[in-house]
Amino acid sequence: MAITAQMVKALREKTGVGMMDCKKALAECDGNEENAIKYLREKGLAKAAKKAGRATSEGLVGTYTHSNGKLVAMVELKCETDFVAKAEQFIQLSKDLAMQVAATSPVCVKPEDLPQEMLEKEKEIYKQQAIAEGKPENIAEKIVEGRVNKYYKEVCLLEQPFIKDDKKTIKDLLNDTIAVLGENMQIGRFARINLAEAVAEESEAE
């Protein structure tokens, strides 16, 4: 199938990847855009893995403030160089991450960061639920595993579906940007302040 400039342009707009890489991906996938996106994502994962050990001493703090001024989120996004920290796609990623934190209120960045006590508590709850449903213990264990993976998607930032495109996770979003900009990137600390939630907690405490 002939790869047209229009096809390449459309893929570039959807992925942010360079024109030559988009053309190559479309050629590899016989012009199928969906498969080309998957191809680019897999290439991005490989690039991200190669760059994972590099030091990330530059970056910026992305912020998001809700229109009512009562909800604010901040995310520390790290990269290798000041040059990339000033790149439009890196800045946009930091803003998207802050918006994600504001919308979903994650507990941690990745599953390994989740407090073990919290995880064990959730596992026990899921196990008791499965047993109460009449499941044998060996089946209950498999059910627990599935529910824990679902729990990760709720509380771990990297595992969450991206609020602007739920077909990709935040990990996908990060790896896509690494593939485009060619540097290792890491999400550091994040914070979320919601005035309405704070007022409600104070009222309950009185």
From Swiss-Prot:
HAMAP family: EF_Ts. Keywords: Cytoplasm, Elongation factor, Protein biosynthesis. Associates with the EF-Tu.GDP complex and induces the exchange of GDP to GTP. It remains bound to the aminoacyl-tRNA.EF-Tu.GTP complex up to the GTP hydrolysis stage on the ribosome. One of its GO terms (molecular function) is translation elongation factor activity. Residues 81-84 are annotated as: Involved in Mg(2+) ion dislocation from EF-Tu. The keyword Cytoplasm applies. One of its GO terms (cellular component) is cytoplasm. Pfam families: EF_TS. Gene3D superfamilies: 1.10.286.20, DNA helicase RuvA subunit, C-terminal domain, Elongation factor Ts, dimerisation domain. It comes from Maridesulfovibrio salexigens (strain ATCC 14822 / DSM 2638 / NCIMB 8403 / VKM B-1763) (Desulfovibrio salexigens). The lineage of its organism: Bacteria, Pseudomonadati, Thermodesulfobacteriota, Desulfovibrionia, Desulfovibrionales. This is Elongation factor Ts.
